[in-house]
Amino acid sequence: MLSKLLTKVIGSRNDRTLRRMRKIVDEINKLEPQFDSLQDEDLKAKTVEFRERLDQGESLDLLLPEAFATVREASKRVFGMRHFDVQLLGGMVLNNCQIAEMRTGEGKTLTATLPAYLNALTGKGVHIVTVNDYLAARDAETNRALFEFLGMTVGINVPNMPPQAKKEAYSADVLYGTNNEFGFDYLRDNMAFRPEDRVQRERFFAVVDEVDSILIDEARTPLIISGPAEDSSDLYTRINLLIPQLVKQDQEDSEDFRGDGHYTVDEKSKQTHLTENGQEFVEELLTQQGMMAEDDTLYSPSNISLLHHITAALRAHVLFERDVDYIVKDDEVIIVDEHTGRTMPGRRWSEGLHQAVEAKEGVKIQNENQTLASITFQNYFRLYSKLSGMTGTADTEAFEFQSIYGLETVVMPTNKPMVRDDMGDLVYMTEAEKFAAICEDIKERFAKGQPVLVGTVSIEKSELLSNALKKEGIKHEVLNAKFHEKEAYIIANAGQSGAVTIATNMAGRGTDIVLGGSWQEEISNLQDPTDAQIAQIKVDWKVRHETVLAAGGLHITGTERHESRRIDNQLRGRSGRQGDAGSSRFYLSMEDGLMRIFASDRVSNMMKKLGMEEGEAIEHPWVTKAIENAQRKVEGRNFDIRKQLLEFDDVANDQRQVVYELRDELMNADDISGMITQNRDDVILAVVDTYIPQQSLEEMWDIKGLEERLKADFDLELPIQEWLDTEEKLYEEALRERIVAKAIEVYQQKEEVVGAEVLRNFEKTVMLQNLDTLWKEHLAAMDHLRQGIHLRGYAQKNPKQEYKRESFELFEEMLDSLKSDVVSILSKVRVQQQEEVDRMEEERRQQAEELARRQQYQHQNAASQIADESDAGQPAESGTFEREARKVGRNEPCPCGSGKKYKQCHGKIN
């Protein structure tokens, strides 16, 4: 009560933030007449003046009012568009490393030019990050004229650019690109062998457009660069033939129940589990096929690979649907992004899932891949000195932005009041009833000329609705993963009178729907339009615009509630831009995924009590509340998954930073002989300690073993026994020093033969090659450790702590192996001349180019990877852990002490 009263008196934190910034807006507005009177040349000269003032120690904050006034004036002259005050506020929020929540149509693209110009004055470069290639190219081309007018360069960063073109793009003052491409460039740069092969420079300031999509929706999916592993396509094909013989069982096995089915499905966590009956049946099938010995079991260590293939194939058949999770095009399985409905060519699911789906669809099975480098968006974007973002929907995720990225969300006021009518949800018993009601509503709105945008959750649903509308004779456009090449055109015309547009899962995001259609689109289609043509197009558009407003503006129809309220708000946000009229409504059924999994019992009972008849809908605040609660549950679970991913990836990230810093040091150094000398001393002394323990009696020494080891590992033939026999005063410490000195002497002789320069180049090449090989193997070891670490809960140990401890041990082992491998190679190799080093370098370059051609860039399905760990990864409760000899029932409390049922905890390991 008191907090509400205080908020009313002094305003919320958001209000106070905006109030402080409005003073600076007033300052910028006062400068407008002065800047308006400047000649073009004087306005352009401001950039040089600002840079000189920065060099003299003036801060960006002091420059901000004048810099923003400069951009606003330049925009008026170049585009004929003046930044609104709310856009100036948005620009300040972005410069302050905060997230600006700006409604659709408020001009986020133009807002970003303000902080981009200000921060680009430093010469360090600004990255404006978008969700797809089309938006990156569009925004770069749209704003290029403005930045170039002010003497700044603009670049674009999209896939498949030649390295030199990428390097030039990164040297631009302002660079537009996609989140994936920035992340992959970072990983590729840290796989390069020469400084000149890298494209990125320092990561200074990033403005992330649609920040919720990139930093929240895609945060669960790490970016992975992988190379081809061994061919196992035949195994996928053979196992794929077995899966259709398995029968689904609806109820989990327990002490009181053992079903006849072979597997159960957990839709919430997207997991499948073999039942006891299923395990026996699969073992029988594998034995018949000669793929497993008769007396063997599926869970024996020798059959881990078979279990991996069975699990992947079962998930592919049961949980991944064609035209929902992926499409098949040109004999390829292409993933559909669950958040945007866009296809993701070149991206592949990991852990054999993609190959299992290829086997299921009968297309060519590509080799499994081995991880070469990976990073999450969370850890990539935290590398920037300054990070900010903008979106139409951030407030529901404000806590996550603050806790994970340290970014405060500021909700921006609209330039004009929002008048959209958001109507209550209508809930039907069946999907058929729901779609019949949607068709009827569209028919009525179509008849009066009101444009309708229909949001669906999958390609399958969009095509189902499309077929129903065709039967009714209603002309419409379908925008989904299959046809997103014409996305911008369809969206540009979605506001025309009577237009009906079906869009899968917010495809087309980033393009405004203008009532009456886009007059800019019409003008761009003309070659050299005259002033008269442009004027006529604007007059015609004005008439169409008023007609659509009179019909009620754009109506949004949601065919299903998304797991996240934010995605629903994004769909609604397409209507009511810039104070336009509009309306929205969601239609739901008890057969929808969200309702079936999370809200079914409560709402279904409510509907039965009300005596619902076929075709009748329920509209009640209780139902809306139940649905919101279901969405909150999913949002909470997804937040936990993202947080879990980050906690595990933070461990790997610390190691990644060490390795990448070492690579940088190696690449930039002309001479690493000091590092090699230190490593050689450490490695040889460690070997000597193994055979001559420190402060030990001579009787405990294994001199013969030491001589053999030095010969085998370092090609050092030393008569150590002879030294000891002939020199009475050759004690342990003196002996250690002599062995190291002899190793140095032999290496110096090698340097005299081949020359210092040749050997320095060779040392660097060997060090880099071995570091990359061992890092790749270390990533694989970390993956294996991660997949099984949740089992430590059985032993009353905290899996996260165990993961940290063991991954550190693995990392130390990797660094020790790097030292010993490099010293061994350099000691044993015979380098004759510079040509040999050049040949070796050329071979390495060719191998790297071949690997680059075969590299896969993918988003790992991290949700499935973590689903097991999210429950088991909690700190174990204290107390004695007693394991019973009998098998734990799936509905019994899990032995790990989490308090959850076994099937919801460690029973998920299948």
Swiss-Prot record:
Keyword hit for ATP-binding: yes
Subcellular location: Cell inner membrane; Cytoplasm
Organism this protein belongs to: Photobacterium profundum (strain SS9)
Catalysed transformations (reactions): ATP + H2O + cellular proteinSide 1 = ADP + phosphate + cellular proteinSide 2
Subunit relationships: Monomer and homodimer. Part of the essential Sec protein translocation apparatus which comprises SecA, SecYEG and auxiliary proteins SecDF-YajC and YidC.
GO molecular function: ATP binding; metal ion binding; protein-exporting ATPase activity
Cofactors (names): Zn(2+)
Basic and acidic residues composition-biased segments: 561-571, 841-853, 880-890
Gene coding for it: secA
Disordered: region residues: 561-584, 835-910
CDD domains on file: DEXDc_SecA, SF2_C_secA
Record's bilayer topology term: Peripheral membrane protein
Protein name per the record: Protein translocase subunit SecA
